[in-house]
Structures are given as C-alpha cells and as structure tokens.
Amino acid sequence: MKIYFAGSIRGGREEEQTYFKIIDYLTNFGEVLTEHVGFKNIDKKEQGSSDTYIFERDVSWLKSANMMIADVTVPSLGVGYEIGFAETLNIPILCLYNPRNKKSLSAMISGNKNLVWKEYNTVEEAKLLIDKFMESN
C-alpha cells in the first residue's frame, strides 16, 4: 500500500514531532511516499528544489497513492490543496485534527462528507484512529 501523508510545511512546523511519530507508525501499513514531511529542517532540505519540481513530484505521488492521511491541526494551503486533489482521485482520506492547537478546523474539512475527519489529543489516540480507518478501507 502507498500512503500519502500530508502535514503543514510552509504554514508552520509546530506539529513536526507529531508528524514524525505518525509517519513512523504508518510504515507498518505500507510505503509512506511523503516521509520527509516529518523531518526536522525540511525547509532547508528542499531549498534546492523549485516550487514547480515540488508540485509535480507531490502530484505524481498523490496519483500513485492508495490512501491519504492528513494532519490538519496547523492550517496549510498546501495541505488543503492536496486533500482536494486526492478527493478528485477518489483516494480514501483521513484528516486528523488536534484541538489543543486552538485553531479552528476549516469548514471545508469538517463539512465535507467525502472525507473522514477525527479529533485526537495524543499520538496514541491518532494511531487508534488510523487503525480503524485502515480496517474500513
């Protein structure tokens, strides 16, 4: 199984450690195409890559993915775009949201009946939500 993990990069890296732990867990289910999202200093690692290269690479990964897990705790234009693109490809999508961040979840996520979104407070809770999502997809 190929899994596309989406998390904020340019929109803010407050959840970087959480991304890393979730991505590590997702490797139990298959190949995580976007494991770099959990890396420290990702912005420095991608400095040599043009925006066009990043866009084309990520779209290619989305087209090859069987499933998307998106952490939507930190608002991100890129993550929103990726979710919308994955939706057009009919890829099952799980959006994870941690309310401790105090940032409101976009109605474009919470109101969309074509995707699943769940709140979590700990990484362990997120893992259980992932397990349930994987079982049903």
Predicted segments with their positions:
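Conserved catalytic or regulatory cores that recognize and/or transform ribose-phosphate-containing ligands
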Residues: M1-N137
